Amino acid sequence: KQCESKCIHLKMGKEAVAIGYLERFAADYERESGNISVPEIAEKNGIKIAVVGSGPAGLSFAGDMAKRGYDVTVFEALHEIGGVLKYGIPEFRLPNKIVDVEIDGLRKMGVQFEKDCIVGKTISYDDLHADGFKGVFVASGAGLPNFMNIPGENFVGVMSSNEYLTRVNLMDAANPESDTPVLQGKKVAVIGGGNTAMDSV
């Protein structure tokens, strides 16, 4: 979108080339046709790389390293691969099926995934090296929220957007019949006005 604000067409009194929509169309067309191409991959070099976290940074790094011939394993603490793409962005803004297509593409490139694995608890840094990993890329993301340190923020029913979105997106907590429903009252206050606040609304 940044290039659209500087598009040469604007100087000619025309609308900017809608590059964002064109990219979206191309990606959707490829996905819906089922003909998703796997990029060219360099010859395997036998070097193992561990990636901690399966969010945007971890997945991007994993793809780049796989293309260069590395053996990549992504370790994810949660039970779903995708990090914030799955737990932090609502389905209406980024459908899970789109994220899953990207993850499947990485699998076709040879990337391995380990779910429910907390590096530092389930497996240690030393364990990774003992298992032959020559490098570790930490892409643990922004899993911990920033609180305001005000009275009442630790009351029952008060939660961070991280907790709320994770519970709704991964644990079906918007369903009143779920094990840990989040819908507890008729009046709700959302503190903040950014994208995450709007996602929580």
Predicted segments with their positions:
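Iron-sulfur (Fe-S) cluster-binding segments and ferredoxin-like electron-carrier domains
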Residues: 2-28
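Residues forming the flavin
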Residues: 23-201
